[in-house]
Amino acid sequence: MTMNWQRNRLWRQVHSRPRLFIAVAVAVALAIFLPESVASHSVTRWLIAWNAGTVLYVILAAVMMIRSTPHRMHHRAQQQDEGQLTILVLVVVAATASLAAIAGELVVVKDMHGFIRFAHIALAGVTVLSSWAFIQVMFTLHYAHDYYAAACHGRPAGLEFPKEESPEYGDFFYFAAVIGTSGQTAEEIGRAHV
């Protein structure tokens, strides 16, 4: 009984977040099957895979966000009602692992010269950018979920958007990106729920 419940819960997580699980599957497959001639160090292999996964996820999420309407966002909030904490923990763990991998890559670089050295340093820089974009998109989805889930449960939303009754993903991305770059909340107003 417990195993069946856990399997159903896992399936609901995969089904409600296909973009995340597709990106993870592609990243893991790339890390496993990337030729050694492309990435001879394991840390380089995992950074390439991480970047491919995060960029794929950001692209898939952007396509979904562009095609979404407030009605679909409301429906998605109901569908993804569980597992929000798990997703945020995974984002923090992934970002921390990414930073550790960057540090590892920079250690590998110290004995390299010329174009190879430049390519490895560029990989570390691209990893910073792709990780930042990934985190902003994850928080965009988290903020949108919380906003519309509050409406599903009859609670006030945690954010107020000026002159906006039904904010779209672009509004939430703007909010996440402003916080992600400056720690400020711009025109949106956050409300604490006690």
Model-derived regions, located:
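Membrane-helix interface/capping segments
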Residues: A62-Q80, A103-H113
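Juxtamembrane helix-capping/reentrant segments at transmembrane boundaries
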Residues: M73-V93
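Short, Lys/Arg-rich, polar N-terminal cytosolic tail immediately upstream
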Residues: M1-Q13
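The first (N-terminal) embedded transmembrane alpha-helix
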Residues: Q13-E36
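Transmembrane alpha-helix/helix-exit interface in multi-pass inner-membrane proteins
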Residues: V128-G154
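Membrane-proximal soluble regions of multi-pass membrane proteins
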Residues: Y147-I189
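Loop-to-helix transition at the N-terminal end of transmembrane alpha-helices
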Residues: H41-I59
